[in-house]
């Protein structure tokens, strides 16, 4: 919803977030749970709200560069498209000019409509440093809504999009290296396989195997493309933590 709001500025004029936290352990939709642990939604929201970001618009299957920050000038934008078997279908990059709240139509993805695929996006500044990235699993068909039973707080869904292909990839071989200094764990993951490692979840645990709370990850619940290396950090006031990877 954050991305839908941003990609439609200035037609969209506001947004309300429901909900921030989980009052009970069993509730969902929250950004962090009953115990203060961020959920996947937290990291997705964080990425959606990057000041400068590439966003896929589900309405027209185009990718837009949005800017609600102070940076103005040229940036390099790049897109990679993979099919549902992790084969690279397309790779494009270009230089575009960006300015505050001036959305730029960067890429046309309509050629892939009707087929399940992955989309990986990057924004780079002049020195080649990646300043934003984004990732999508696009189903062959969109959700089908039951508009006849629309109410002010909910629109029921007749048929959900089929995203099972994202979890049907062969298990990827992901190598992990960790280091610790001054209260910060640095974790580097490398996907040594030729398939998309869709959901990589990092956890910091104590000697008894309990999750360390709070633990502040720079990113989590993220994909790794074939051959990709990614480094993240975790601030936790516990030395000797065991870093675990679920995928």
Report residues per predicted region.
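Carbohydrate-binding surfaces of carbohydrate-active enzymes
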Residues: 1-219, 224-234, 242
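A compact, surface-exposed functional segment
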Residues: 241-247
């Amino acid at each position: 919803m954050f991305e839908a709001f941003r990609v439609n500025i200035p037609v969209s004029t506001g947004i309300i977030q429901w909900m921030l936290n989980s009052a009970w352990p069993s509730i969902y939709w929250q950004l962090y749970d009953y115990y203060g642990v961020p959920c996947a939604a937290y990291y997705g929201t964080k990425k959606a709200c990057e000041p400068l970001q590439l966003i896929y618009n589900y309405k027209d299957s185009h990718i837009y560069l949005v800017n609600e920050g102070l940076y103005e000038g040229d940036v390099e934008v790049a897109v990679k498209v993979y099919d549902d078997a992790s084969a690279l279908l397309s790779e494009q990059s270009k230089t575009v000019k960006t300015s505050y709240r001036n959305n730029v139509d960067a890429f046309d993805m309509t050629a892939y409509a009707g087929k399940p695929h992955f989309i990986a996006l990057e924004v780079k500044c002049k020195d080649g440093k990646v300043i934003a990235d984004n990732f999508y699993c696009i189903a062959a068909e969109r959700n089908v809504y039951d508009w006849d039973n629309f109410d002010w707080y909910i629109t029921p869904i007749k048929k959900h999009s089929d995203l099972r292909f994202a979890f049907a990839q062969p298990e990827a071989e992901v190598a992990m290296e960790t280091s610790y200094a001054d209260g910060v764990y640095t974790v580097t993951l490398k996907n040594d396989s030729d398939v998309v490692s869709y959901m990589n979840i990092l956890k910091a645990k104590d000697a008894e195997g309990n999750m360390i709370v709070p633990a502040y990850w720079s990113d989590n619940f993220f994909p790794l493309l074939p051959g990709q290396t990614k480094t993240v950090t975790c601030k936790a006031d516990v030395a000797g933590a065991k870093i675990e990877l679920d995928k």
